[in-house]
Amino acid sequence: MTQQIKYKRVLLKLSGESLMGSDPFGINHDTIVQTVGEIAEVVKMGVQVGIVVGGGNIFRGVSAQAGSMDRATADYMGMMATVMNALALKDAFETLGIKARVQSALSMQQIAETYARPKAIQYLEEGKVVIFAAGTGNPFFTTDTAAALRGAEMNCDVMLKATNVDGVYTADPKKDPSATRYETITFDEALLKNLKVMDATAFALCRERKLNIVVFGIAKEGSLKRVITGEDEGTLVHC
């Protein structure tokens, strides 16, 4: 029986940390294989998938790692870290027989295409996974903002924010055992309750463009597929 697909084209935001697994830094092979396997399953269902990946598993511009380094320089280093992650994802997809393309907001033609919106949309329509690297290409903007921007540019049905928790909670579930998960919440309610769904710039862009967000746990087996088919998974942040 063919499963109902709620979202035809999605922008998936993956943090760099989600690729570390149990390692203290870098890319964990088993973790990236598991993550890509989950995504490949929905691609085979006919879902068009764009991915924005962070670089925090390698280097984060806003961190103690950067020390007294110039902020713009540190951010550019973080962008290059996202390119490394994007190449690793592309390799993992192609190992599974899924065609993938990396588009970078910074020009590095030997290893990735330079971002071009029409070409990216064409790839999505052809069933290829498009991995957007190097954030927005500008310092001082997070990869959350890059994800909101690419999601809007690609005319995605939804932005999927993969995290290490399975949704948005009333409080930090690691600190407060009585915290409960929201199944749905509006943008206005999230602002009123000061729930940190993502950074303010990204959140404002999604709200303005009416790009709904689903926050879910990518490490939970089958979670992405359940989101795509409209099951109760994660938290839907909507207009």
From Swiss-Prot:
Ligand binding (ATP): 13-16, 56, 60, 163-164, 169, 172
Gene Ontology molecular-function annotations: ATP binding; UMP kinase activity
Function: Catalyzes the reversible phosphorylation of UMP to UDP.
A Gene Ontology biological process term: UDP biosynthetic process
Record localization: Cytoplasm
Pathway noted in the entry: Pyrimidine metabolism; CTP biosynthesis via de novo pathway; UDP from UMP (UMPK route): step 1/1
Sorted UniProt keywords: Allosteric enzyme, ATP-binding, Cytoplasm, Kinase, Nucleotide-binding, Pyrimidine biosynthesis, Transferase
Coiled-coil features, chain-numbered ranges: none
PANTHER family assigned: URIDYLATE KINASE, URIDYLATE KINASE PUMPKIN, CHLOROPLASTIC
Gene expressing this chain: pyrH
Stored CDD domains: AAK_UMPK-PyrH-Ec
Gene3D superfamilies named among the record's database cross-references: Acetylglutamate kinase-like
Enzyme Commission designation: 2.7.4.22
Uppermost EC category: transferase
Organism: Neisseria meningitidis serogroup B (strain ATCC BAA-335 / MC58)
CC terms in the record's Gene Ontology section: cytosol
Activity regulation, free text: Allosterically activated by GTP. Inhibited by UTP.
NCBIfam families tied to this protein: pyrH_bact
Binding site for UMP: 55, 75, 136-143
SUPFAM superfamilies membership: Carbamate kinase-like
Name of the featured protein: Uridylate kinase
Known catalytic reactions: UMP + ATP = UDP + ADP
Subunit relationships: Homohexamer.
